[in-house]
Amino acid sequence: MPESISCGGVIVRQQQSTVYVALVKEGGVADYILPKGRLKSGESLEEAARREIEEEAGLFELTLVGKLGVCKRLNYTRKRWVSTHYFLFLTRQVNGMPTDKKHDYELRWFAIDKLPGIFWPEQEDLIHANRERILRIFQ
């Protein structure tokens, strides 16, 4: 079965004492996701993650904290394996204007302890598994 490589990010910011996570959803779709997408030829993993975050969330003022890990799953059509490399980014940017003109993405910030249902279960697991690491950034 073919495999593709994707990259994305967990983007966090703090407002007062609450830590928020950026999630996106496409118009007409009920569930939120972390911004992510395919690696393009010639890009580093981090460059691809930053590009996808800007395209889907409109966030570009990003400080890399580190790599969170790789999640592997079947794609939506269950015909291809996808390995997604996730990075943790810190931002002070609140508003974003997604740059992907082919899709209608909406950015929303959610408190880390009040996340909505996330379409891809491994993304929700990734956030929960790294919760303490994320919170330590702001101590």
Model-identified regions with their sequence ranges:
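Generic secondary-structure boundary signal with a strong preference for alpha-helix termini
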Residues: 20, 49, 133-134
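Class I (Rossmann-like) S-adenosyl-L-methionine-dependent methyltransferase catalytic domain
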Residues: 1-4, 13, 74, 112, ...
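Catalytic cores of nucleic-acid ligases and guanylyltransferases
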Residues: 139
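Unchanged
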Residues: 37-66, 70-126
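N-terminal strand-loop-strand
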Residues: 1-34
